[in-house]
C-alpha cells in the first residue's frame, strides 16, 4: 500500500515539475510577444508616429516609461522567484526545542514535530512539499507558474511579482482598450491587438485575484498552507515559562487563533522588510532565518494562562 502511495507521489511530483518548466516558458514567450506588440504597434505606431494626421507624442512616451517601470520590476521579481533557492529544512538543531524557547509548534503528543518522510526536525511554520518532496521553511505553496515552492526565501519576491504584474497588465488593458475605441472599428481589429487585449484581461483577472488573496494573508501573517480551514484549525504548542513553571506543557490553541498576527504594520514588515525601498525593490528577501517567528503578545498571554492553569 505504501509503495503505491509513494509511486503516486512520485508521479504527481514529476508532473508538477514538468508543468513548472512548461508554464514559465509559455509565460515568458507570451509576455514577451505582448511587450513587443504593446510597445511597437500600440505605443509607437499608434501614438508617437503621425497616422492619419493624429499624433500623441507625450501620451505614447508616458505609456512607454510607465510600462517599462512596472513590467521591468515584474520581470525582475519573477526571475528572483524563478532562480531562488528554496529554504529547505534539515539543519535545525535540537536545541531549538530547549527550555530557552518558551513556545513552539509541536505534535499532538507534545513532542517536537518531525517529518516522517524527510526524518528531519520541523521548526515553526515548516511543512513538507509534495512536489519538491522536501521539508521547507515557512512553506506557502508550490506554484507551477514559476516552477518553485513559494516559501520563506522568496515570498517577498512572489508578492512583488503579483503587484507589479497586475499593475503592468492593468496599464496594457486600459490603454489598449482606449486606443481601440479611438482608432479601430471592432470588425477591423488586428489579430495582434486582440491577443494583447485578451491576454492582458486574463492577467488582470488572475493576478488581481492572487494579489488580493495574498495581501490578506500578508496582513494577517498567515500563508496559503496555514489559511486552509484557519477558522477551525487548532494548533498544538509546547509551552514553558521558567519563572512560573518547572516543565513544558502541551497547550492547544482555540479554533481561529492566529498565533503570529502582530497587527497589520508588523505583519507587513515581517515579510516586506522595515524600509520603504525594500517594499518597492525586489532585492532583499524577508528578514529573519525562517525558523524563529515572533508570536502575537496576546496569543502568548493566552497560552501562558492556559499552561499555568494546567500546571497548577
Swiss-Prot record:
> Would the keyword Membrane turn up in this protein's UniProt record?
yes
Q: Which GO terms describe its biological process?
A: protein targeting to membrane; vacuole fusion, non-autophagic
From the Swiss-Prot or TrEMBL record, give the protein name.
Answer: Palmitoyltransferase PFA5
Q: Which InterPro entries match?
A: Palmitoyltrfase_DHHC, PFA4/ZDH16/20/ERF2-like
Report the coiled-coil segments.
none
E.C. number(s) listed in UniProt:
2.3.1.225
Quoted from the entry, the domain comment is: The DHHC domain is required for palmitoyltransferase activity.
Domain DHHC: residue ranges = 113-163
A cellular-component GO term for this protein: cytoplasm
Amino acid at each position: 500500500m505504501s509503495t503505491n502511495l509513494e509511486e503516486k507521489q512520485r508521479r504527481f511530483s514529476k508532473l508538477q515539475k514538468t508543468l513548472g518548466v512548461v508554464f514559465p516558458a509559455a509565460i515568458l514567450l507570451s509576455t514577451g510577444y505582448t511587450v513587443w506588440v504593446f510597445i511597437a504597434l500600440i505605443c509607437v505606431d499608434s501614438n508617437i508616429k503621425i497616422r492619419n494626421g493624429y499624433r500623441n507624442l507625450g501620451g505614447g512616451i508616458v505609456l512607454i516609461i510607465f510600462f517599462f517601470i512596472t513590467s521591468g520590476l515584474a520581470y525582475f521579481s519573477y526571475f528572483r522567484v524563478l532562480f531562488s533557492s528554496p529554504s529547505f529544512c534539515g539543519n535545525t538543531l535540537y536545541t531549538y526545542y530547549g527550555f530557552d524557547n518558551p513556545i513552539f509548534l509541536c505534535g499532538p503528543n507534545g513532542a517536537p514535530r518531525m517529518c516522517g518522510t524527510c526524518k528531519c526536525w520541523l521548526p515553526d511554520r515548516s511543512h513538507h512539499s509534495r512536489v519538491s518532496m522536501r521539508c521547507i521553511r515557512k512553506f506557502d505553496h508550490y506554484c507551477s507558474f514559476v516552477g518553485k515552492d513559494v516559501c520563506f526565501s522568496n515570498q517577498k519576491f512572489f508578492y512583488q511579482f503579483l503587484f507589479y504584474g497586475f499593475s503592468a497588465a492593468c496599464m496594457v488593458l486600459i490603454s489598449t482598450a482606449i486606443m481601440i475605441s479611438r482608432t479601430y472599428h471592432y470588425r477591423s481589429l488586428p489579430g495582434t491587438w486582440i491577443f494583447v487585449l485578451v491576454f492582458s484581461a486574463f492577467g488582470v483577472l488572475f493576478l488581481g485575484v492572487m494579489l488580493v488573496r495574498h495581501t490578506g494573508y500578508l496582513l494577517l501573517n498567515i500563508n496559503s498552507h496555514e489559511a486552509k480551514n484557519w477558522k477551525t484549525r487548532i494548533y498544538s504548542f509546547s509551552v514553558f515559562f521558567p519563572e512560573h513553571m518547572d516543565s513544558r506543557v502541551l497547550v492547544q490553541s482555540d479554533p481561529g487563533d492566529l498565533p503570529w498576527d502582530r497587527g497589520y504594520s508588523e505583519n507587513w514588515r515581517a515579510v516586506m522588510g522595515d524600509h520603504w525601498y525594500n517594499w518597492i525593490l525586489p532585492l532583499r528577501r524577508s528578514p529573519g532565518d525562517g525558523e524563529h517567528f515572533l508570536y502575537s503578545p496576546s496569543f502568548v498571554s493566552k497560552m501562558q494562562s492556559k499552561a499555568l492553569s494546567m500546571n497548577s
